[in-house]
From Swiss-Prot:
It comes from Priestia megaterium. Transmembrane segments: none annotated. Keywords: 4Fe-4S, Cobalamin biosynthesis, Iron, Iron-sulfur, Metal-binding, Methyltransferase, S-adenosyl-L-methionine, Transferase. Is also able to convert cobalt-precorrin-3 to cobalt-precorrin-4. The keyword Cell membrane does not apply. Pathway: Cofactor biosynthesis; adenosylcobalamin biosynthesis. The keyword Transcription regulation does not apply. [4Fe-4S] cluster binds at C402, C405, C439, C443. Binds 1 [4Fe-4S] cluster. It catalyses: Co(II)-factor III + AH2 + S-adenosyl-L-methionine = Co-precorrin-4 + A + S-adenosyl-L-homocysteine. This is Cobalt-factor III methyltransferase.
Amino acid sequence: MKGKLLVIGFGPGSFEHITQRAREAIQESDMIIGYKTYVELIQGLLTNQQIISTGMTEEVSRAQEAVKQAEAGKTVAVISSGDAGVYGMAGLVYEVLIEKGWKKETGVELEVIPGISAINSCASLLGAPVMHDACTISLSDHLTPWELIEKRIEAAAQADFVVAFYNPKSGRRTRQIVEAQRILLKYRSPDTPVGLVKSAYRDREEVVMTNLKDMLNHEIGMLTTVVVGNSSTFFYDDLMITPRGYQRKYTLNQTEQPLRPHQRLRKEAEPWALDQEEAVKQSASAIEAVQNTREETAASRALAEEALQAILGESTSAVVHQPIESIFEVAVSPGLANKKFTPVQMTTLAEVVGEKGTMEYTPDHQIKLQIPTAHPDMIIEKLQAASFLLSPVGDVFTIKACDFCDGEKSDAIPHTEELQKRLGGMDMPKELKLGINGCGMACYGAVQEDIGIVYRKGAFDLFLGAKTVGRNAHSGQIVAEGIAPDDIVEIVENIIHEYKEKGHPNERFHKFFKRVKNVYGFDYQDITPKIKVEPAPCGD
């Protein structure tokens, strides 16, 4: 049975601004997936739906889980504040589906349910600032290069758009709104009206009227939408108004208008409008010129391709794809047991990273590389030629092995390599680390990882569910001792596949083990330290 995806925009957050269709869709759903703050905002509308809530930067895992559950036959609601199609989850859900080869006719059904976007809800609190041409620009450069955002701000400022800035500032991103103000001041008066709206229609709503010059003197954060007026926007009685232009034709303080209805659309009543006849002539000339250019270009291209084909003796494609540069991330190490980098490897790292890339040594005995490139395959080839072990970065399975006393205690190495071969780099609900130690000393801390195996007296001990960070961090629970070497790989593999299949997005293994109570026949026991621990400020 096919499931269904309901991608819901629930507006600013107040129940009275949630559309009837959005309410119905929430009630229809078997499962609600969303950012945890958004789930809390609609808590009063939930009944017995299964809830999966995750933190910021987990949008992809939410979309993937939603698709997975819908393909399993469930009706899944993916929620966004505002409108799901405006910086929301709608596009990402489509992208995940497309990656899986989804087709509208044969795949799971998808419905996008619109909501009130921030530009609309904030405008209603400010007055009527978006009565004329407007645009939205997100200042978050986590996914969009800042150079491109700058161009968009510049274009909007030059064109006299009313601009609504989303995601203007965060704890780490503080310069973007400063740069946006600088660009706008090149084209607009310092007295241009600006409205700052925080948490529109929520409990901690704040509305501030200011101007372009002074806007940074007020608190601006991730929950703020910054609305910058155009050259005609004005303040009146604590309201921000952008005229539509009616004053050009109408007398707003009189009931008797100078132009009769049949006169208002005549050419002489709109001297500022585009001359339609001249525009048609110019358009026809432009089209003819473009057509001639295209024909000339096509002829030249055909001739060039014919010559190239004669040289190469094979057909060539007329389509040329411009390479797109992006940040390529990969983790490298000398090997699972080997912890020693060679001079050749270090030289190779310097070469492939270059001036623009970065290298970061991690606690997992790897070096994480971030390299701007349009050709990641060439980088992979160079790293492999230098005998690096390559691992993907993110929510994947990673082995953190000891050095087996520089190879002297090597009995566990073949099993380590087999686990890497079968599972290394596999996608997980959350990053999953398997610690492996080659003797009972466990000096590399295998018992402190999500899953730990320790080779001792010719067999393996198995530890599950360590909590690796926080004041209440603890070692894994020992669930089995003396596992035969021939069995350990299969046991670990089954545990990991069960976590991959049943774990929630962003759910760490120790939380998964606690929730399901039993993993591959191993029972959970609460070994959390019995002390009062305040929640970590980061939300751990």
